[in-house]
């Protein structure tokens, strides 16, 4: 059972403030490749006044996370296409080289999954090892690339001290229920002078617009400044940049126990302004939904994922009002979400016999509009419920 925390999991302080409370937050798990099931939980998002980091104050417990990771995250293959994942890994390796990371020594990837990225590091000259609890993915890493994986969640005790020259943890830290302990583990296993590279969602750019930035399986929410603070508290120093909605921290283990951090006032002000904008945005969108209901227009959703769950959790939209669900990923077509009784369809279906209003719920907002252009040309309506998708089209730029 989830319990409310009374101390910050990042810095240990007790000066916590509630930002948002959601009575029923919806999220999906996938028992198999062909099933999707709703879960509904209360959610409280808060802010630490001591370190400026946002987090869930009622975080998921280990049982809930195990269910998510062993199913929705554990289904193999993933929804992402092989070419898409290969391009992500290629681009990230080029980023590391440009950042001055030596392609030599021993490397660890936490959350290594099927070993594709480690294979690239291996080809570049590193001796590699993975850490991931997913047995199917680890087996694929060994079969396809000869990459060995420690089947476990990373902790300070998973590997001996000073084992690695480089550690990568991409889109992992936001999932960790004890982030301070996790970063302490990185400090232990990375040799002095070695490097770590982390990726986490850039919640700062989303908060600035007043859009939801939370996911149930993400207990932690970082801005560029709060991520760098967390690294410096553990003796890492470097830079944080933003790339298409993702923060990238490349930091060196200085050997110091900790380093000074900057003032948290900017992040606290950002969080307070977010709360005001979020409440205003939800109120305005609920007014639009009320008008759609008055007109008797049937509503469909384009996009099935975190934007969809936040749409249902943050606004007055009820799942019973949805007449159709569309998604641009062919791997999802035909899947039926338990409780909705609606199969996921190709967005091309909209152009054939679209509903009254399509609610856009995906990061691919510009492409979605192009995909349903015939529907829009003949008078169909599309609404962007939350501003988040547009933000994630931004190019790379320095954030800290």
Regions found by a protein language model. Name each.
Residues 2-162, 166, 170, 244-247, ...:
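Conserved N-terminal segment of class I S-adenosyl-L-methionine
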Residues 13, 125, 146-147, 193, ...:
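A generic structural signal for alpha->beta connector loops
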Residues 17, 150, 239, 345, ...:
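General small-molecule cofactor/ligand-binding pocket signal
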Residues 22-23, 29-31, 207-212, 337-338, ...:
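Short aromatic-enriched loop/helix-cap "lid" or pocket-rim segments at secondary-structure transitions
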Residues 32-37, 42, 211-225:
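Acceptor-substrate binding/catalytic loop of class I
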Residues 82, 172, 176, 217-220, ...:
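Hydrophobic alpha-helical scaffolding
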Residues 93-210, 221-236, 249-253, 309-310, ...:
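Conserved SAM-binding loop
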Residues 120, 248-400:
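Hydrophobic, well-ordered beta-alpha structural blocks that scaffold small-molecule cofactor pockets
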